[in-house]
Amino acid sequence: LPYDYQLWIDSDIVFNTEKFWQLLDMALPEEAVTTEPIYEDVKDEKGEVVLGDDGKPKTKLTGLKQIVDTEKERPISAGWYATEDGRTTSVAHWLEEDDFRSNGGVMNHEMVEGISKRKKPFTVDYTGFGWVLIKNGVFEHPEMKYPWFAPKMQEFESGAVQDMCGEDVSFCLDAIEAGFDIWCDPRIRVGHEKTRVI
């Protein structure tokens, strides 16, 4: 099935179309797109090219062509949502072994209070799959082995600490290992329907 992007949405996510377009805008940042004018020769009523005073064909602007630099696209782009406690978000950063152990085996999640103050997209090590856009080429990358969402054992350097991570965490680990950045835009918050919409 040919596609440009896949949008992964959990069934408990609350959003409007503006949030979708914001996600697409983040995946294609301004610096990834250049615009070139398209000109055509001016023709008379007989269909012949009209020449200017300098003897060269007259031209007119007929459109604009946008060119995407695929190296500047963001292959994995996410918004965020609050989890059930209303304070923790769906994006996180990995911790070093000692910090992971002292944090009770939990990643360093962005908190609602902190992420709300951010103004620009930033990279994360993990995103929940409730609201994430994935570019064609990520799943197809040779280092992204199927099944893409298989739980796996995350082992820290010393071997003394291990964590059985879930399917979305394992996908993020594999994506980063394959060289993909995971981006989050703090301005793209979607609702998360639990006992209430948070």
Feature roles, as predicted:
Residues 2-4, 44, 127, 160:
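Alpha-helical hydrophobic/aromatic positions enriched in membrane-embedded helices and signal peptides
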Residues 3-14:
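Short beta-strand-to-loop acidic/aromatic patch adjacent to the donor-nucleotide binding site
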Residues 5, 74-76, 182:
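Short, Asp-centered acidic motifs that coordinate Mg2+ and/or phosphate
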Residues 9-11, 79-82, 187:
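Active-site-proximal beta-strand/loop segments in catalytic clefts of secreted hydrolases
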Residues 14, 82-85, 190, 196-198:
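Surface-exposed, flexible loop/turn segments at secondary-structure boundaries
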Residues 16-154:
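Conserved catalytic core of nucleotide-sugar-dependent glycosyltransferases
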Residues 143-198:
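C-terminal catalytic/acceptor-binding lobe
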